Amino acid sequence: VDAHARRLVSSFEIIIVDDGSFDSTFKESRALCAQYPLRVLRLSRNFGKEQAIMAGLERTVGAAVVILDADLQEPLSHLETMLEHRAEGYEMVYAVRAQRRDETWRKRLFTRAFYALLNIGSDTAIPANARDFRLMDRRVVDALCALPERNRFMKGLYGWVGFRTKAVAIELAPRATGASKFGFAGLFKLGLPGLSSFTAWPLRVWTGIGM
């Protein structure tokens, strides 16, 4: 990350959010602070991805902010393209997964159905296959941080705050280490705030029950 950033911009800061890990993430990250422009934020417990993202965003100060997962599957070569689109006037440039052939058919079906439900019942367009990997202007970050929601569905909020957006298709690289712990349970837990906050489905269900 440091090498890519130095090639593209004159000044930057890296913020690592340790979302209540039990391994050596915090210790090893802190050890790098003397060598790199790095800050490490350690949460008191595992709050989940959405809250970890917001905790990091609230501590940024730059004119532009990039969100990047720690699994290193998203090629940093796309940062240059994102910056070019920002120079064209786009205030948020986000990555979209080009294909999902490495996933099971059940997970692909669940994801497709989930986004279909979201977009049928929502006034805000929520792109399917969009990643959290994105470059955002300071105004976008400030707008997200000003929202009062505690249980957040970030992919919905990215679209809800508005601004000019641009999608960039990417191919994911293999995970650098380990295996993903984000399975169906994580998808379901993440999806509930999305369905309840960004669609009319809960109202329709309760209306149907009342009838």
Task: Name the predicted role of every residue range.
Residues 192-211:
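Alpha-helical bilayer-embedded segments of polytopic membrane proteins, i.e.
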Residues 41-45, 49-59, 76-157, 173-192:
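Acceptor/aglycone-binding surface of glycosyltransferases and processive sugar-polymer synthases
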Residues 18-27, 72-73:
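A conserved acidic beta->alpha catalytic loop
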Residues 5-10, 33-37:
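Short helix-capping segments at alpha-helix termini
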Residues 43, 68-70:
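Catalytic metal- and UDP-sugar-binding loop of GT-A-like glycosyltransferases, i.e.
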